[in-house]
Amino acid sequence: MSQVILDLQIACADSQGLPTEGDFQRWLEAVLPLFQPVSEVTIRLVDEAESHDLNLTYRGKDKSTNVLSFPFEAPPEIELPLLGDLIICRQVVEKEAIEQEKALLAHWAHMVVHGSLHLLGYDHIDDDEAEEMELIEIEIMHGLGYPDPYISEKDPD
């Protein structure tokens, strides 16, 4: 039996129009039990200022970003289901969905799936890793009823 514990923190000045806690729970449950039966994740929804600050502090990038992943690494002698934190910037997600002509809810789901895979150790630094990660993301997104997140809705079939 799998269990996913979500700690949802809303730090946006305006919380209108955000996905529901149930949406975030469903998206996590589509990913995490595939890799770990019991897991706990914090998702913090932030505005651009906080995203920019964290991105500059931890990645040296002087801009806000869609999702930041902070994996938790327990000492080897301690077993905890805590995977880590996802920081998702509302304005960047909304802007990207418009620019890429994607459904907003689908883009939110993709950010959660993508960030969760980072917490589980997946990365896209080299082409092989990127391809493996993208294939997993596409499969999970399809399972959730969403289209391939790497093909924008404006792209021809």
From Swiss-Prot:
The gene is ybeY. This is Endoribonuclease YbeY. InterPro entries: MetalPrtase_cat_dom_sf_prd (IPR023091), YbeY (IPR002036), YbeY_CS (IPR020549). Binds 1 zinc ion. Pfam families: YbeY. PANTHER family: ENDORIBONUCLEASE YBEY, CHLOROPLASTIC. SUPFAM superfamilies: Metalloproteases ('zincins'), catalytic domain. GO terms for molecular function: metalloendopeptidase activity; RNA endonuclease activity; zinc ion binding. Its EC number is 3.1.-.-. The keyword Ribosomal protein does not apply. It comes from Yersinia pseudotuberculosis serotype O:3 (strain YPIII).
